[in-house]
């Protein structure tokens, strides 16, 4: 099962095999105010599957030059750290911020690094982390910009000590946001957590054998909360 800020006031079930907890609040740059309680609940998972009993997920975004965005980088440095950026140098032109692959990478890095360092996660290396990629969060029409930001998120998570990182999405949303991922990208070959929508456990198990998002393997399939579990999504292990 997976929970986040929408379940703050909801009763959480017992004896789930494993649980995935959302680190962010309503927006990617906000905290999940119930993180401590939900992590404690997840830690009591019964186990019995190949999945780690407690996992985490964080939200992807790429607002670009949207004036409503609270932050957009103007250099390759974030909080005193200058990560290796294969897209080049993020900077300004005529004193104005620029939407470039390099700046998208640094923005993604800022999200990932903050998720690990300021959201309240102790021992980040102890968990498997997932990046939640959905259309209802900010993203660019150019998939190359979103891929750069996703690579930055992975770099930021790793800089904070995370070791295992997978991708959560649906095939259609992933295609719209990330497009085609080349083998030269650190996105390629990562474990997938696929959202199936309203469905059944039988169909979820069948979806374990469907085409992965970016050359990886499908580790889990999510069934929408509307199927038999109130406000909490159910997840089926594929391993």
Where are these regions (language model features)?
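Substrate-binding cleft of extracellular glycoside hydrolase catalytic domains
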Residues: 1-149, 159-160
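Glycine-rich, charge-decorated loop segments at or immediately adjacent to ligand/cofactor-binding or catalytic sites
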Residues: 64-72, 173-184
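Functionally critical loop-and-helix segments that line ligand-binding/catalytic clefts
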Residues: 1-13, 184-239
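Conserved residues at the C-terminal ends of beta-strands
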Residues: 22, 168, 223
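Structural recognition of alpha->loop->beta junctions
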Residues: 77-81, 95, 109-128, 178-217
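Aromatic-lined carbohydrate-recognition surfaces of secreted/lumenal glycan-active proteins
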Residues: 56-57, 157-179, 190-199
């Amino acid at each position: 099962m997976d929970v986040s800020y929408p379940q703050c006031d909801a009763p959480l079930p017992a004896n789930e095999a494993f649980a995935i907890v959302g680190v962010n609040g309503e927006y990617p740059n906000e905290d999940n105010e119930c993180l401590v309680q939900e992590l404690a609940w997840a830690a009591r998972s019964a186990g019995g599957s190949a999945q780690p009993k407690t996992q985490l997920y964080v939200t992807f975004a790429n607002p670009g030059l949207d004036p409503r965005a609270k932050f957009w980088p103007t250099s390759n440095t974030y909080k005193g750290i200058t990560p290796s950026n294969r897209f080049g140098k993020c900077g300004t032109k005529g004193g104005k911020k620029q939407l470039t692959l390099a700046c998208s990478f640094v923005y993604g890095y800022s999200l990932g690094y903050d998720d690990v360092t300021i959201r309240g996660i102790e021992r980040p290396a102890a968990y498997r982390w997932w990046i939640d990629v959905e259309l209802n969060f900010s993203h660019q029409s150019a998939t190359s910009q979103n891929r750069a930001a996703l690579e930055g998120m992975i770099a930021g998570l790793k800089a904070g000590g995370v070791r295992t990182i997978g991708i959560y999405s649906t095939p259609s949303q992933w295609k719209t946001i990330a497009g085609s991922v080349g083998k030269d990208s650190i996105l390629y070959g990562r474990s997938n957590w696929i959202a199936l929508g309203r469905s059944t456990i039988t169909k979820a198990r069948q979806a374990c054998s469907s085409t992965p998002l970016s050359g990886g393997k499908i580790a889990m399939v999510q069934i929408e909360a509307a199927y038999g579990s109130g406000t909490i999504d159910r997840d089926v292990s594929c391993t």
